[in-house]
Amino acid sequence: MRQVKFREMLESLRQDLSGVPEHRTGRNTQYTIVEAGLAAFSVFYMQSPSFLAHQRDMERKKGRNNARSLFGVERIPSDGQIRNLLDPVEPGQLGGSFWEVYRYLDEGGHLEQYRGVGGTRLVSLDGSQYFS
């Protein structure tokens, strides 16, 4: 069983984000697409109502924050800025990272507990794309 390495998965995501074309016009480019993407990814690890407030609070109390320490995000965009930067990005542009992370998890045996009837994978959907 192959051990999943966080840094490998993060580097794959960083490479995909680096290839996303800049969609903004003008000079309003305080945060890069890479910073916004890594910050968005880090939100999955840090459950907090306000990602930015939590990171700033951690920085104030401990002198560092998880976004920088774990994900290499030096300048932390707000939740709204992350959405504004990433909403225009086509999901297919990050497909390589998704499948690479999937492969790491699958090879490491971490997905076995998510098998359903007939050996199929169980997938959680939030329902935002489905209507009755």
What do these predicted ranges mean?
Residues M1-S132:
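Dynamic "connector" segments at or just before major functional cores
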